[in-house]
């Protein structure tokens, strides 16, 4: 079956159920290795197993396409059934792929794998795939390193998929595939060592046990393009859909956004208290499990940094409350008594402000600790089978997850108490919200879909902003850009791995090509070796610098002990360079990124004010013009 809409020719092979799109004479076809399928607990079920499959050409007021119906699974009339609709929008030639559940009987679905991955077999550096794992990744088809499993299984709106799209370019022709229903979906990708191919496709998962709603992937095809063009397609998309809010707009809402621009970031803590049941508990070295730094000591450190010449700084404080870092959440008050209590904390905050610095705290409204004073399983996230997820990964030991419907209430309760003690917060970091997937809760008293969970998380950010407190979270995610002012970091994936780990592609600032002027991103500044200085990535991305980054967990989340130690004055000097650039370009669009050689050793970014940053990672050299 074949139909045309302008320069788009859409074809369906009715025997294999594979599609082909011809766009301005360039052919994009699903790989012969791809079979549309549903994955269940009992195995994979190809779409061809449905006994009654019909394809009908249709047209409507905005486009035309092919409507397919799948009925009579295993010959049963009253059985699991679904439709697919593939159509071309006439006004912009977007090709929409839609999978729609009709009758959800008899099958317990784990994933739907549709639409298919493209045939992309030529082992050429001119052919490459774009993935949104972390800040972004470009995989040439001839890349020597095999692609590892994606973080969070490639789930959209996690650190494995900051933005819900992927793309491919071959000899100057390309496509971007945008998930317009990203909440229960993700990508899977395969690239063997040396290529010659890269395959990338989409998976959809159930919501609260059922597929429940239409799943949509939108393809835009371009000629004479590169990855910059695909990013700008998505930038226009998020503007059209109301997801884009610039720092300029956020500063109108909360003027202190302007004060944060150009700051160096200091990340440190007060109290560590590792539960003996925690995976992090070290019985051989008990001194590592429990220790306290007083508020007064942190106050003195801030004064020392001022004496060394630091003038713009944001202090992010972990473990400031009595339970200790990652303990008893969401019941995380009062301020740590042994460290000085509310009075000591207020003195620290007041001193930071007297020095012209900004101050914020770490907090957590997802991890729900079983020993929290008000813990009640009735408010935990319930899975569809009635159970609750549990683990003891973090310092606080055994935990489950707080249902996201409850998070805004606890934010309001806790911060009302904090503010009542005269503590003026410039910012607050709500842990994991923009890194981990949204939760789903099957408890009928507070049922919540993943999409709704993101809205509840956003409500927490908005409440903070309403009080003049700048919102922050662990990483960055597409859903949060209306309400997130800054983050802990937005790194390339390799930065979260041990130094020296081979890169599974060329790190690329895909996120910043879309959202640079929407969010403030602090960057790690470690000089890992003579040929790996993370400062160059901070400059390339026009980001803010970390002056001190004392991670709560050693060798976790990019907090590694190895690396060349630099004197503090040298650290300050380096941060001044990065912060100075950030002050200049923070509100500018990153209009262009260039790879100046085949391996990404030399790169350049251009910002909308005309500023260019060129880096050479091998020579540890940068140039700002």
PLM feature spans:
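Generic detector of solvent-exposed, compositionally biased contiguous segments
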Residues: 1-6, 39-54, 391, 503-524
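Carbohydrate-recognition beta-sandwich/jelly-roll modules
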Residues: 2-315, 320, 337-339, 355-358
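Conserved, mostly hydrophobic/aromatic
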Residues: 7, 99, 305, 352, ...
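Short acidic, gly/pro-rich beta-turn/loop elements at beta-sheet edges
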Residues: 13, 31, 78, 107-109, ...
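Active-site-proximal substrate-binding groove within the catalytic cores of carbohydrate-active enzymes
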Residues: 15, 19-24, 171-173, 181-186, ...
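Short, surface-exposed, polar/charged, turn-prone segments marking secondary-structure boundaries
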Residues: 31-32, 38-40, 48-49, 342-345, ...
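Short loop/turn segments at secondary-structure transitions that flank enzyme active sites
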Residues: 105, 118, 321, 365-367, ...
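Aromatic-lined carbohydrate-binding/catalytic grooves of carbohydrate-active enzymes
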Residues: 258-413, 423-428, 434-446
């Amino acid at each position: 079956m074949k139909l045309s809409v302008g320069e788009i020719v859409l074809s369906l092979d009715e025997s294999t159920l594979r599609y082909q799109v011809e766009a301005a004479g360039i052919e994009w076809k699903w790989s012969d290795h791809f079979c549309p399928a549903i994955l269940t607990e009992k195995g994979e079920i190809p779409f061809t197993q449905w006994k009654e499959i019909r394809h009908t050409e249709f047209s409507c007021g905005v486009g035309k396409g092919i409507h397919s119906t799948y009925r009579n699974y295993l010959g049963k009339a009253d059985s699991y059934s679904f439709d697919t609709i593939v159509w071309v929008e006439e006004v912009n030639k977007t090709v929409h792929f839609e999978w729609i559940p009709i009758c959800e009987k008899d099958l317990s679905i784990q994933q739907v794998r549709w639409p298919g991955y493209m045939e992309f077999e030529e082992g050429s550096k001119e052919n490459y795939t774009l993935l949104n794992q972390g800040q972004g990744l470009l995989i040439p088809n001839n890349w020597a390193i095999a692609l590892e499993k994606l973080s969070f299984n490639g789930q959209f709106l996690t650190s494995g998929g900051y933005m819900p799209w992927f793309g491919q370019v071959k000899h100057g022709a390309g496509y971007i595939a945008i998930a317009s229903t990203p909440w229960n979906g993700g990508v899977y990708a395969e690239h063997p060592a040396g290529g010659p191919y890269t395959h990338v496709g989409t998976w959809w998962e159930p919501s609260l046990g059922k597929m429940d709603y239409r799943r949509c992937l939108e393809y835009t095809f371009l000629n004479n393009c590169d990855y910059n063009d695909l990013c700008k397609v998505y930038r226009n998309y998020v503007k059209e859909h109301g997801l884009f809010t610039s720092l300029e707009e956020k500063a109108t809402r909360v003027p202190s956004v302007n004060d944060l621009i150009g700051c160096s970031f200091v990340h440190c803590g007060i109290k560590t208290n590792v539960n003996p049941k925690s995976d992090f508990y070290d019985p051989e070295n008990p001194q590592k499990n429990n220790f306290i730094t007083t508020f007064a000591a942190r106050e003195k450190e801030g004064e020392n940094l001022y004496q060394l010449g630091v003038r713009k700084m944001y202090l992010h404080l972990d473990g400031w409350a009595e339970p200790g870092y990652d303990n008893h959440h969401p019941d995380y008050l009062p301020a740590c008594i042994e460290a000085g209590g509310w009075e000591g904390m207020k003195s620290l905050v007041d001193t930071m402000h007297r020095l012209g610095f900004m101050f914020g705290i770490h907090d957590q409204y997802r991890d729900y600790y079983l020993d929290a004073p008000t813990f009640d399983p009735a408010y935990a996230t319930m899975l569809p089978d009635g159970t609750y997820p549990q683990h003891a990964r973090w310092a606080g030991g055994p935990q489950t997850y707080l249902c996201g419907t409850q998070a805004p209430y606890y934010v309001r309760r806790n911060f009302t108490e904090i503010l009542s003690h005269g503590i003026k917060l410039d910012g607050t970091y709500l842990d994991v919200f923009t890194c981990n997937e949204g939760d789903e809760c099957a408890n009928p008293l507070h049922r919540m879909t993943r999409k709704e969970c993101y809205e509840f998380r956003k409500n927490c950010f908005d409440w903070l902003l309403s009080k003049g407190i700048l919102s922050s979270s662990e990483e960055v995610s597409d859903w949060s850009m209306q309400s997130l002012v800054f983050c802990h970091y937005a790194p390339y994936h390799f930065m979260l791995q041990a130094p020296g780990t081979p890169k599974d592609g060329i790190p690329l600032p895909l996120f910043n090509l879309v959202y640079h002027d929407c969010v403030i991103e602090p960057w790690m500044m470690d000089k890992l070796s003579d040929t790996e200085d993370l400062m160059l990535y901070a400059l390339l991305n026009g980001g803010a610098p970390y002056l001190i980054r004392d991670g709560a967990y050693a060798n976790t989340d990019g907090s590694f002990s190895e690396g060349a130690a630099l004197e503090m004055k040298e650290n300050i000097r380096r941060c001044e360079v990065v912060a100075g650039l950030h002050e200049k370009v923070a509100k500018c669009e990153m209009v262009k990124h260039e790879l100046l050689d085949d391996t990404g050793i030399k790169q350049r970014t251009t910002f909308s004010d005309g500023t260019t940053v060129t880096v050479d990672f091998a020579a540890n050299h940068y140039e700002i013009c």
